[in-house]
């Protein structure tokens, strides 16, 4: 039995052994960005920093007491890369495409991992064992190459996932995910200065059986298709969409999803709008005449399904991601769905 004591912030804890990787998200009250990011440290301080991961403590519990499982960094960077690549969809919500991808340019280079996220956006993942001041600039260099060589990436997607996936790549919202032992406060500031979608993700091993991921900073690039969603000012009247009751309901759903927490990103596709943290937690389809369909990442088997309100769509084709379908017709339905929306948000 494992007991988690978490004073603040969120992350994902997974068991790194075998193909049946179990994962869950741990979520508590939010911290400020400054509180979650450790000050810069040198190579000589790495050992001291291994136990400092935003106050997270993991305990092994028995009838006779508890034993703390000390966090540690990977022995080598490749250990982290191999683990994440083997379970990238579970850990990051990204379909793995290629490892150590050699780019064809004058200066050369190898992209650690290439992938495609749930909404079809290209993803570059870079790894560092500890703290590395150059990881963001290195990733941005690779992203610039990627956006200038779309055919190469499109061919890779076609070879791995087929022609349909290759034709639906979301080029307006490429992403960079940096997975490292830690980041400095300067890193967190730097990502805000770039007009790109960047996630800084901190990792730790806990003993030999557990592996933790924690998003410490997330910034979305300025584009029409993928933009950081900001909550409306307190007391300001909601801005309603044109198009009748269902359009107004869609706007109300948008306000609720945005209000679930800081750092929510809306990615607009033709068939749906995805709301994500590191991964999607809700997808909202365009309003129908009498109802609005919302798809969540909640497990339908853990929900009391109600005919005409919730439906298990596991294995069924639909736009967006998620196995639980919500059918909303009124704002009262939206109120009923509150717990399910929060459950899906926490799982992302």
Located regions from the model:
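Charged, terminal alpha-helix-loop-beta segments
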Residues: 2-259, 265-268, 272-283, 289, ...
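Short amphipathic alpha-helix segments
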Residues: 298-306
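Basic nucleic-acid-binding interfaces
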Residues: 326-328
């Amino acid at each position: 039995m494992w007991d988690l004591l978490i004073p603040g912030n969120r992350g994902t804890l997974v068991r790194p052994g075998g193909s049946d990787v179990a994962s869950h998200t741990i979520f508590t009250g939010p911290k400020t960005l400054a509180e979650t990011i450790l000050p810069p440290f040198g190579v000589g301080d790495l050992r001291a920093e291994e136990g400092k991961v935003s106050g997270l403590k993991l305990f092994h519990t028995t009838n006779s007491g508890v034993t703390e499982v000390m966090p540690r960094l990977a022995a080598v960077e490749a250990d982290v890369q191999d683990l994440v690549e083997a379970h990238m969809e579970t850990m990051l919500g990204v379909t793995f495409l290629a490892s150590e991808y050699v780019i064809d340019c004058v200066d050369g280079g190898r992209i650690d991992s290439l992938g495609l996220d749930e909404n079809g956006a290209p993803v570059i993942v870079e790894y560092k064992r500890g703290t590395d001041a150059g990881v963001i600039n290195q990733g941005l260099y690779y992203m610039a190459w990627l956006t200038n060589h779309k055919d190469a990436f499109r061919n890779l997607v076609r070879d791995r996932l087929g022609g349909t996936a290759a034709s639906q790549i979301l080029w307006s919202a490429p992403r960079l995910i940096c997975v490292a032992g830690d980041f400095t406060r300067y890193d967190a500031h730097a990502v805000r200065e770039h007009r790109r979608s960047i996630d800084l993700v901190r990792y730790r091993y806990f003993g030999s059986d557990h592996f933790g991921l924690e998003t410490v900073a997330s910034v979305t690039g300025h584009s029409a298709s993928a933009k950081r969603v900001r909550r409306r000012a307190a007391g300001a009247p909601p801005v309603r969409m044109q198009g009748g009751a269902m359009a107004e309901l869609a706007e109300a759903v948008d306000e609720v999803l945005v209000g679930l927490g800081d750092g929510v990103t809306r990615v607009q596709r033709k068939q749906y709008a995805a709301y994500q943290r590191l991964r999607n937690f809700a997808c909202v389809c365009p309003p129908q005449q009498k109802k609005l369909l919302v798809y969540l990442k909640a497990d339908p088997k853990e929900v009391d399904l109600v005919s005409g309100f919730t439906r298990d769509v596991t294995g069924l084709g639909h736009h967006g991601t998620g196995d639980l379908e919500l059918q909303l017709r009124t704002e009262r339905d939206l109120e009923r769905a509150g717990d399910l929306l929060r459950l899906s948000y926490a799982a992302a």
